[in-house]
Amino acid sequence: MNFEIINTRRNNKIYTNRIDTYKVFNENYDKRLVFLESFITTEVEAAGVKVPSIKEVTFNDNHWCFKSDSIKGDTLFSLIKNDPDNVDKYLDKMVEVHTSIHKFKCPKLPIQKDKLTDYIKLSDLDEGMKIDLLDMLNTCPKHNKLVHGNFTPHNVLVS
């Protein structure tokens, strides 16, 4: 079976054989983060968001891997790259997708505002910067609406 690499990221590579998609994490990637991502993806799917359904999580040759359904379509990044004259149309689509995600609620997921607060407090930033960031964050509402943790044109498929 032939596998095509479709994306390379900082912590993983994504392959497909046109039937399934495989997200292969870098060697020795933290097991807890793999299962956390699997849990989050499953909760998002259960909420009704169209995401690839994870079929299995495996460990082989020091690499954690998700196997999921392949979704046909092009990333917004590739559409923008191949058709730059219509970048405004694609950015409008990205805004549409992003705002539609906020309509979903996932009460079992960590609250994004709490996560960001913890990240800021535990960061190596100077105290003044931490205070400024926490002040800005405190102006945001606290809710359990779904927030995409890595929303980029690379992560939006248009079918």
Locate each region found by the language model.
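ATP-binding glycine-rich phosphate-binding loop
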Residues: 1-17
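A conserved alpha-helical element in kinase catalytic cores
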Residues: 10-11, 21-66, 78-100
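Active-site beta-strand-loop-beta-strand hairpin of nuclease catalytic cores
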Residues: 16-20, 158-159
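Anionic group-transfer/hydrolysis microenvironments
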Residues: 25, 71, 150-152
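Residues at helix-coil transition
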Residues: 46, 72, 103-106
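Short pocket-lining segment of the protein kinase catalytic domain that shapes the ATP-binding cleft
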Residues: 66-74
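An alpha-helical support segment within catalytic cores of ATP-dependent transferases
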Residues: 103-154, 159
